[in-house]
Structures are given as structure tokens and as C-alpha cells.
């Protein structure tokens, strides 16, 4: 039986309070880090753990930290990406609402490792409760010596600030988030330079996801070998999976990285609704290409899903049953990306505009011969030709829908109607 690590406090009464967190051993990792490790040793510990970023890209966290220049001549910043705008994803919200001190401790240890004295937590503006709980937790931590000047009697100074987002999905992209933090229009930057060298205010900056940072104190307390012992060697550790869609028991599940998608859906989430069958599953938020029912044995980790033609992304698992029209679903998803495109890149801005028009035409029973080929051409023109991955996510998802459920698109065009209505 897998014992929760990241979610161990979420169902504890008053789990968001400092007293509850301390009673469960909270902030011991920060004491240990400051008292027993140098910053470089913390970086090496996280490298050895093989912790990979939980925000979507899966980049090795310790390696990202090591890119920060030792003597930059400028202040260093730590930014927590808590924007969480990916449809089907809600894991970070639960941590911030129910166990905010876990994130704050992760921020403090991580900042100590990279030499940052200031952190910004960029929270999705709609997360009103999460923002309130984080602000309360920051105040508690400051009053009790876990934040501020000379933390726990050490020479380490550290402050955390909350920044509320204004509803733009693009701020989930790290450099667009930095632009927003600086008070500018949220649009992705051209890289290089990468944030580790020139990020917030042109200073060295590390950007990590909420779940990634929450893992750090546990690695400090239990060791890198413990972390590597959970899940696959190349993608180890506990993982938060967000289950939603047409499934009996939607919710947030913490399980080892690498669990099969079928086990996750059928055993833990209870399978499809009564009288229905699973048709497909989106494994990592709507940016991730759909996995058809026959391929659900795939492991829920970065490498396995990439090999299967999809991606783990934010682990927002959306279950789709046999009552769903894939043309309608694909249209709604592309409409979302079209609406959220920042407009900076022509292939994304214009390509998604045309893609929406063609999909709506097909959905309405007004599709024409050649429309599917046109959609494929549009996907080819968008993919790999934009500053960020928003356009890529849209193109990959639509390509997968056309590949696995082409017959439904053809039926809409040939029969001039939706077969599901």
C-alpha cells in the first residue's frame, strides 16, 4: 500500500495551519538543510534523486538549479509557477489550499540551494482560497522564524511574495510568467538567454512548479535513494494525478510515478460511469495527445508516455467514454487554445484561427472534401514554429484525434451530421 507523501496533510483538520504542519514534522527539512548541508550539497542531493519538474516539461530539477551562475553580480530569484491554467489540472491548488507550509518549506530549501533571497509565487487569480491560505501561511512562517532575516538563527535571509495572475493561460509558460511579473504583457520570450542566466529583471532565476518544490523537503529528510526507489529509475518519485471526466471517482490521487494509465483509471478512479465504456483518455491536460482505450497499459511517466506519442504534462487525466463525439471534443479544445493564444507568433495566431473555422464547419455538418487534409496541413504549419509550446500542444492533440478517431471526422463530413446525436 502506497503511503501518501505530498498529500499526507490534505485531509488533516486544520492542515493549512503552521501548528498542524509542525506537529507532523514540518520545517525539519529546512532545519536540516541549513544545519547540515551547503547550498551546493542540496543541489547535488536533488540531482541524485532524479527529481524531474512536475509542471509539464519533466526537466531534471537539480540540473536546472546547477545552471544558475555562482557569482552573477545580480540578485537571484526563485519563482513558483502556480498559475495552473491547464484544463483538467487541480493538483497545485489542493497543496496551496490544504498544506501551504509544505510549499513554503520547499521554497525555502530550494532558495537556499540556489542562493536566492526572494521568491515570487505566481498564483492563478481565480484561486481565491489558495491565495488567502498562502498569504496566511507566509505570515505564520515569518512570525515563527521560517522566513525573514537570519532564518532559524542562520545567515540565510529569505522572503516570499504572492503575485496574482489575471486569467491568462499563457502565463503557465515560464518566460510569459516572468513578463507578467515585471508588469508587461504576458508573451513568451525568445530563448536563449534562459531564465537561469537572465530571467526576472534580467537576473538569474529558477522557475519551478508547486508539486516540484513540494518534493524537495522530503528528499532532504529521506534521502535521494528513497526518492529514486519510487517508480521508474528515470522518472522516480511520488506523483499527483488529477482524475476528471466521465469516471466514477474523479479526484486527486497520489501514486508512484509510472503506474499504468489503465490501473489509474479502472482501479483507483473506479472506471467509467455505469453503462458506459472508456473510449480514450487524455493523460496530461488538454495539451497532451489522446490515448485510445486499447493503449491504456502505458506507464504514467515522462518517458513511457513520450514513447507512446503523448506526454505526462501536468498529469491532468481526463477520461472520455463512448458517448463522446471526438469531433466536438477536439473543436472545444482547439477553441480553448485559440482563445488563449497570446498572438505573438503568426503560425499560432493565424493557424489556430483557421483550424477553429474548419473544425466548426465539420462539427456543424458542413464539412467539405479535403478538410481533414487541410487540418493536417495547419497542424504541420503550427508545430515547431512558435516561441512556446501552446501551438505545439494544440497541433499534437488534434493530430492524435485525427489519427485515432478519423472515422468520426469522416462521418461528420459524409453524413452531414454528428453520429452521436
UniProtKB/Swiss-Prot annotation:
<dbReference type="GO" id="GO:0051287">
    <property type="term" value="F:NAD binding"/>
</dbReference>
<feature type="binding site">
    <location>
        <begin position="165"/>
        <end position="212"/>
    </location>
    <ligand>
        <name>FMN</name>
    </ligand>
</feature>
<dbReference type="InterPro" id="IPR011537">
    <property type="entry name" value="NADH-UbQ_OxRdtase_suF"/>
</dbReference>
<dbReference type="Pfam" id="PF01512">
    <property type="entry name" value="Complex1_51K"/>
</dbReference>
<comment type="function">
    <text>NDH-1 shuttles electrons from NADH, via FMN and iron-sulfur (Fe-S) centers, to quinones in the respiratory chain. The immediate electron acceptor for the enzyme in this species is believed to be ubiquinone. Couples the redox reaction to proton translocation (for every two electrons transferred, four hydrogen ions are translocated across the cytoplasmic membrane), and thus conserves the redox energy in a proton gradient.</text>
</comment>
<dbReference type="GO" id="GO:0048038">
    <property type="term" value="F:quinone binding"/>
</dbReference>
<protein>
    <recommendedName>
        <fullName>NADH-quinone oxidoreductase subunit F 2</fullName>
        <ecNumber>7.1.1.-</ecNumber>
    </recommendedName>
</protein>
<dbReference type="GO" id="GO:0046872">
    <property type="term" value="F:metal ion binding"/>
</dbReference>
<comment type="similarity">
    <text>Belongs to the complex I 51 kDa subunit family.</text>
</comment>
<feature type="binding site">
    <location>
        <position position="348"/>
    </location>
    <ligand>
        <name>[4Fe-4S] cluster</name>
    </ligand>
</feature>
<dbReference type="GO" id="GO:0051539">
    <property type="term" value="F:4 iron, 4 sulfur cluster binding"/>
</dbReference>
<keyword id="KW-0520">NAD</keyword>
<keyword id="KW-1278">Translocase</keyword>
<keyword id="KW-0004">4Fe-4S</keyword>
<keyword id="KW-0479">Metal-binding</keyword>
<feature type="binding site">
    <location>
        <position position="345"/>
    </location>
    <ligand>
        <name>[4Fe-4S] cluster</name>
    </ligand>
</feature>
<keyword id="KW-0285">Flavoprotein</keyword>
<dbReference type="GO" id="GO:0008137">
    <property type="term" value="F:NADH dehydrogenase (ubiquinone) activity"/>
</dbReference>
<keyword id="KW-0830">Ubiquinone</keyword>
<dbReference type="InterPro" id="IPR019575">
    <property type="entry name" value="Nuop51_4Fe4S-bd"/>
</dbReference>
<feature type="binding site">
    <location>
        <begin position="53"/>
        <end position="62"/>
    </location>
    <ligand>
        <name>NAD(+)</name>
    </ligand>
</feature>
<keyword id="KW-0411">Iron-sulfur</keyword>
<dbReference type="InterPro" id="IPR037225">
    <property type="entry name" value="Nuo51_FMN-bd_sf"/>
</dbReference>
<feature type="binding site">
    <location>
        <position position="388"/>
    </location>
    <ligand>
        <name>[4Fe-4S] cluster</name>
    </ligand>
</feature>
<dbReference type="InterPro" id="IPR011538">
    <property type="entry name" value="Nuo51_FMN-bd"/>
</dbReference>
<keyword id="KW-0408">Iron</keyword>
<dbReference type="Pfam" id="PF10531">
    <property type="entry name" value="SLBB"/>
</dbReference>
<dbReference type="InterPro" id="IPR019554">
    <property type="entry name" value="Soluble_ligand-bd"/>
</dbReference>
<keyword id="KW-0614">Plasmid</keyword>
<dbReference type="Pfam" id="PF10589">
    <property type="entry name" value="NADH_4Fe-4S"/>
</dbReference>
<feature type="binding site">
    <location>
        <position position="342"/>
    </location>
    <ligand>
        <name>[4Fe-4S] cluster</name>
    </ligand>
</feature>
<dbReference type="InterPro" id="IPR001949">
    <property type="entry name" value="NADH-UbQ_OxRdtase_51kDa_CS"/>
</dbReference>
<keyword id="KW-0874">Quinone</keyword>
<dbReference type="GO" id="GO:0010181">
    <property type="term" value="F:FMN binding"/>
</dbReference>
<dbReference type="InterPro" id="IPR037207">
    <property type="entry name" value="Nuop51_4Fe4S-bd_sf"/>
</dbReference>
<keyword id="KW-0288">FMN</keyword>
Amino acid at each position: 500500500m502506497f503511503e501518501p507523501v505530498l498529500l499526507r496533510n490534505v485531509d488533516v483538520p486544520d492542515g493549512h495551519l503552521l501548528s498542524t504542519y509542525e506537529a507532523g514534522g514540518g520545517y525539519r527539512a529546512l532545519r536540516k538543510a541549513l544545519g547540515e548541508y551547503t547550498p551546493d550539497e542540496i543541489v547535488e542531493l536533488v540531482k541524485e534523486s532524479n527529481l524531474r519538474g512536475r509542471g509539464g516539461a519533466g526537466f531534471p530539477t537539480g540540473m536546472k538549479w546547477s545552471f544558475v551562475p555562482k557569482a552573477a553580480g545580480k540578485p537571484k530569484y526563485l519563482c513558483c509557477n502556480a498559475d495552473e491554467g491547464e484544463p483538467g489540472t487541480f493538483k497545485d491548488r489542493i497543496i496551496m489550499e490544504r498544506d501551504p507550509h509544505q510549499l513554503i518549506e520547499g521554497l525555502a530549501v530550494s532558495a537556499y540551494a540556489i542562493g536566492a533571497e526572494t521568491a515570487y509565487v505566481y498564483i492563478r487569480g481565480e484561486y481565491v482560497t489558495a491565495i488567502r491560505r498562502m498569504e496566511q501561511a507566509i505570515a505564520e512562517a515569518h512570525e515563527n522564524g521560517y522566513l525573514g532575516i537570519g532564518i532559524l538563527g542562520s545567515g540565510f535571509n529569505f522572503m516570499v511574495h504572492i503575485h496574482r495572475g489575471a486569467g491568462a493561460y499563457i502565463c503557465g509558460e515560464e518566460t510569459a510568467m516572468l513578463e507578467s511579473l515585471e508588469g508587461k504583457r504576458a508573451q513568451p520570450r525568445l530563448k536563449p538567454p534562459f531564465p537561469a542566466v537572465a530571467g526576472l529583471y534580467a537576473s538569474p532565476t529558477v522557475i519551478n512548479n508547486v508539486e516540484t518544490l513540494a518534493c524537495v523537503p522530503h528528499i532532504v529528510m529521506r534521502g535521494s535513494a528513497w526518492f529514486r526507489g519510487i517508480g521508474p529509475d528515470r522518472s522516480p518519485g511520488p506523483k499527483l494525478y488529477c482524475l476528471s471526466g466521465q469516471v466514477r471517482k474523479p479526484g486527486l490521487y497520489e501514486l508512484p510515478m509510472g503506474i499504468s494509465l489503465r490501473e489509474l483509471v479502472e482501479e483507483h478512479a473506479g472506471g467509467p460511469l455505469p453503462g458506459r465504456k472508456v473510449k480514450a483518455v487524455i493523460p496530461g491536460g488538454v495539451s497532451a495527445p489522446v490515448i485510445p482505450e486499447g493503449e491504456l497499459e502505458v506507464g504514467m511517466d515522462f518517458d513511457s508516455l513520450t514513447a507512446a506519442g503523448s506526454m505526462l504534462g501536468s498529469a491532468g487525466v481526463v477520461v472520455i467514454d463512448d458517448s463522446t463525439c471526438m469531433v466536438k471534443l477536439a473543436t472545444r479544445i482547439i477553441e480553448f487554445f485559440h482563445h488563449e493564444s497570446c498572438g505573438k507568433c503568426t503560425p499560432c495566431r493565424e493557424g489556430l484561427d483557421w483550424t477553429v473555422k474548419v473544425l466548426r464547419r465539420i462539427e456543424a455538418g458542413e464539412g467539405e472534401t479535403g478538410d481533414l487534409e487541410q487540418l493536417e496541413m495547419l497542424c504541420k504549419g503550427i508545430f515547431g514554429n512558435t516561441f512556446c509550446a501552446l501551438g505545439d500542444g494544440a497541433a499534437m492533440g488534434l493530430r492524435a484525434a485525427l489519427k485515432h478517431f478519423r472515422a468520426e471526422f469522416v462521418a461528420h463530413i459524409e453524413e452531414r451530421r454528428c453520429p452521436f446525436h
